[in-house]
């Protein structure tokens, strides 16, 4: 999976940070220490960590992910990260 989206709401400095959806790579989620949760009323699961986004971004940088874009939507901040694939067609 070459792309990852992470997001946080309201408090950038403290977390929690949403790091993946139910289809995310389990090995990356394990590396981040994420837990899979389903919020009451939602019909999908998400992976969350208690760490702030900066620490998550640092961890993803160590395994080769780079920020492609970042945006704010209301009180939510979202980062899109990409990892170059070693498979070339």
UniProtKB/Swiss-Prot annotation:
Pfam family, one: GFRP
InterPro entries: GFRP_sf (IPR036717), GTP_CycHdrlase_I_reg (IPR009112)
Record GO cellular component, one term: nucleus
UniProt keyword list: Cytoplasm, Membrane, Nucleus
Lineage: superkingdom: Eukaryota
A Gene Ontology molecular function term of the record: GTP cyclohydrolase binding
Family matches, as Gene3D superfamilies: GTP cyclohydrolase I feedback regulatory protein GFRP
GO biological process: negative regulation of biosynthetic process
Subcellular localization(s) per the UniProt record: Nucleus; Nucleus membrane; Cytoplasm, Cytosol
Entry function: Mediates tetrahydrobiopterin inhibition of GTP cyclohydrolase 1.
PANTHER family assigned: GTP CYCLOHYDROLASE 1 FEEDBACK REGULATORY PROTEIN
Membership in a protein family: Belongs to the GFRP family.
Self-association and partners: Homopentamer. Forms a complex with GCH1 where a GCH1 homodecamer is sandwiched by two GFRP homopentamers.
Protein name stated in the entry: GTP cyclohydrolase 1 feedback regulatory protein
Organism in which the protein naturally occurs: Danio rerio (Zebrafish)
Gene from which this protein is expressed: gchfr
């Amino acid at each position: 999976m070459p792309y990852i989206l992470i997001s946080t709401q309201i408090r950038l400095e403290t977390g929690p940070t949403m790091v993946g959806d139910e289809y995310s790579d389990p090995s990356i989620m394990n590396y981040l220490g994420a837990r899979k949760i389903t919020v009451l009323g939602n019909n999908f699961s998400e992976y969350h960590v208690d760490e702030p986004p900066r620490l998550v971004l640092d961890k993803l940088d160590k395994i080769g992910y780079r920020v492609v874009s970042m945006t704010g939507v209301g009180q939510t901040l979202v980062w899109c990260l990409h990892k170059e694939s070693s498979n070339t067609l």
